[in-house]
Amino acid sequence: MNKHIRAFSLPVVMVVSVLVSLLVLFALSLADLECQEYQVYHTRKQRILDLHSAVARYCIDSNMFYGQGDMVRVKLFDMSASHVVLTRKDWGLYEVLAAKSDYLPLSYTVVCGKARGSDLDAAIWIRDRSRPLSLSGNTRIDGHAYVPQSGINYTGVSGEIFHGDYVEQSAMRISSGQLPSIDSSSLNNIQNYRDSISQAWYFRNSQAEYIDHSAPTVLLYGKNSDTVYHLGGNQILYGDKLTISADSHLDGIVLIARTIAIEDGFHGCGQFFCTDSLLIGTGVHLSAPSGLFVSGHEHPYIAIGKNSKVEGYVIVLNGGKEDKELRYPSLAQQRGSQISGLVYIDGAAMLAGVVNGSAFLGDCFTQVNGRRCPGVLRD
């Protein structure tokens, strides 16, 4: 009886051993599969980080394209066999930078600012008109102030005394009678946009979509009666008098018109180029990378309403025309509004809100009870 039991136990032990071996092999296979999945995940993550690193490298060294045209292959590590392919193109006054991996079907596209327009580390630069700059109200200047040789006066306007911050002597610099020059190649790009209007076709919201910058640029035009637009990416919208309502959705497009009016409450992103005027309502938020540019008319003009924000550049070029009586101001920024970026006005500007960045002004003024006071900054 005992021999029979032992003889029967041997196959059972063998079966159990085989099952245990299979379980061990299955566990090892799962572990190996997890290692392979992690390796694929890690490789993909590293390639994505490589794309970001290549873009960051370009942002600190734009000379990497020198002699290479608009495309360059970047090798980030000596021991790595893979490269990142960078391509760039102008988009308004910005650049579109696309990074692609030659190892995996991955890409990364960003819109970034171009090279610094000036080597001057200026918070504000006022053209010397043989009169001092006057500060009134709650005006504050943080950073280097390039002012006329006659310096700065701290004064009261309409009974409101100066209660801002005094500018340290060490932060003051002497300006000149001419504004620092700007990159003329960017102006050529704008003219090229304007010359392409004949190729545009009529805009219809039902056909709107986001167009990637790797695709051909879509050229559209809007009628004066149109007010709602849903457009994004690689698209240019033309018109004579464009009106952008709060119901519109714009994501990084370029707009070209004689005049543009952005109605109260609009939130979006775009670069707006006009030849006459650009009117921003109240409570408007133009997120980065946006921009306002007016040039070409006898009296170009930008108005920014209360509680509005512009994240990007604000530029008005009037050819340096003299306007001593301030009949045709170039920029009127209302109190409570904010500009984050470059302000370049070769005419007269009223800065009554906040500017985070640099402001280059041909002249400045404030307005009290319908009267314009030249040479005064007042917040």
Language model features with spans:
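Glycine-rich beta-solenoid repeat tracts in large extracellular/virion proteins
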Residues: 242, 260, 302, 329-332, ...
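Flexible, glycine/small-residue-enriched loop-and-beta-strand segment within the central core
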Residues: 284, 288-311, 320-322, 327-330
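Extracellular/secretory-pathway and virion-surface proteins
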Residues: 29, 376-378
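Short, ordered "entry" segments at domain starts
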Residues: 88-236, 247-249, 266, 272, ...
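Structured N-terminal alpha/beta-domain signature
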Residues: 34, 51, 218-221, 227, ...
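Short acidic-hydrophobic surface loop/beta-edge motif
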Residues: 70-77, 365-373
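Beta-strand/loop motifs with alternating small/hydrophobic and polar/acidic residues, enriched
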Residues: 2-128
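Long, well-ordered mid-to-C-terminal structural blocks that present hydrophobic/aromatic surfaces
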Residues: 237-238, 243-300
